């Protein structure tokens, strides 16, 4: 006998913050290179531009993960040396995904970085969705730790 699992849409958000012992300018240089994601995000094999624009609103990147899954992301907001916001248009089991990476100097040598996102799933079970949320949270945390290590060298 198979159990009938009810599938529906789910919504959640993730917010992860880390303190980095590096100047705001150094942190911004690293994160604002949107095709440089593979230098600090875990399980990212490569990131390529899909647009002529490399920075600011309208820049588009394609992320290829080590398992060969891909995600397409479009920058939709940008404030130099403060934040950028992007949406995923392909590659996730979601109907909507918007994320912002922002920085705030705490002093000349320490910067607070926050990565937060909101998402709404395609139809899936609650258990599947919670697994996805856990995976995304771990991806953010481990990637931010990598970023911190690379900037504090």
Residue ranges and their predicted role:
Residues 2-6, 59-62, 87-89, 101:
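Short, P/G- and charge-enriched loop/turn segments at secondary-structure junctions
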Residues 47, 61, 84-86, 113:
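Well-ordered beta-strand positions enriched in small/hydrophobic/aromatic, beta-favoring residues
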Residues 1-51:
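Hydrophobic ligand-binding cavity/cleft-lining segments
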Residues 112, 119-153:
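A conserved amphipathic terminal alpha-helix motif
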Residues 1, 43-44, 54-57, 81-87:
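Short Pro/Gly-enriched beta-strand edge/turn motifs at strand-loop
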Residues 14-16, 59-61, 73, 99, ...:
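Hydrophobic residues positioned within well-ordered beta-strands of beta-sheet architectures
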Residues 17-21, 48, 62-64, 74, ...:
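Generic structural detector for well-ordered beta-strands
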Residues 38, 65-110, 118-121, 149-150:
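Hydrophobic-ligand binding "helix-grip"
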């Amino acid at each position: 006998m198979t159990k009938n699992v009810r599938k529906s849409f789910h919504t959640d958000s993730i917010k992860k913050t880390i303190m980095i012992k590096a100047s705001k300018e150094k942190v911004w240089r690293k994160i604002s290179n949107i095709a440089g994601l593979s230098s600090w995000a875990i399980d990212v094999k490569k990131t390529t531009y899909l647009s002529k624009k490399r920075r600011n609103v309208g820049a588009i990147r394609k992320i290829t993960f080590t398992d060969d899954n891909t995600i397409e992301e479009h920058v939709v907001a940008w404030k130099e040396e403060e934040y950028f916001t992007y949406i995923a248009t392909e590659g996730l089991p979601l109907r909507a995904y918007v994320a912002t990476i922002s920085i705030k100097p705490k002093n000349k040598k320490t910067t607070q970085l926050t990565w937060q996102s909101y998402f709404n799933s395609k139809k899936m079970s609650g258990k599947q969705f919670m697994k996805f949320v856990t995976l995304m949270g771990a991806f953010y945390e481990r990637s931010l730790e990598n970023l911190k290590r690379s900037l504090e060298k």
